[in-house]
């Protein structure tokens, strides 16, 4: 295997995981903060807010998992070789 392609694949895998986790991390923090604020304002709506929060957190976490899948594909099933 060409060492330049191997090095570029490792760097790309690291960037894929790193960049794929920045957006969802910020989004999850914002969503959790807004959920806590909403529950503090309307405690009677806690169940509905918590359910919506957990569903949206799962969708945001899926984006990070996609980045991990791309990184694993670059590391173990390198299409550039």
From Swiss-Prot:
Single GO cellular component term: proton-transporting ATP synthase complex
Primary location class: plastid
Taxonomic lineage of the native organism: Eukaryota, Viridiplantae, Streptophyta, Embryophyta, Tracheophyta
Family from the record: Belongs to the ATPase C chain family.
Bilayer disposition of the protein: Multi-pass membrane protein
Keyword Cytoplasm: no
UniProt name for this protein: ATP synthase subunit c, chloroplastic
Gene Ontology MF terms in the entry: lipid binding; proton-transporting ATP synthase activity, rotational mechanism
Site description Reversibly protonated during proton transport, residues in chain: 61
Annotated coiled-coil segments of the chain: none
Keyword vocabulary terms for this entry: ATP synthesis, CF(0), Chloroplast, Hydrogen ion transport, Ion transport, Lipid-binding, Membrane, Plastid, Thylakoid, Transmembrane, Transmembrane helix, Transport
Record-linked InterPro entries: ATP_synth_csu_bac/chlpt, ATP_synth_F0_csu, ATP_synth_F0_csu_DDCD_BS, ATP_synth_F0_csu_sf, ATPase_proteolipid_c-like_dom, F/V-ATP_Csub_sf
Record's keyword annotation contains Transcription: no
């Amino acid at each position: 295997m060409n060492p330049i392609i191997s090095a570029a694949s490792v760097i790309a895998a690291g960037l894929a995981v790193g960049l794929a986790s920045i957006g969802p991390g910020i989004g999850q923090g914002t969503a959790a903060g807004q959920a806590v604020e909403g529950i503090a304002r309307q405690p009677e709506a806690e169940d509905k807010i918590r359910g919506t929060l957990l569903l949206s957190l799962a969708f945001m976490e899926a984006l990070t998992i996609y980045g991990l899948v791309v990184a694993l594909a670059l590391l173990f099933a390198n299409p550039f070789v």
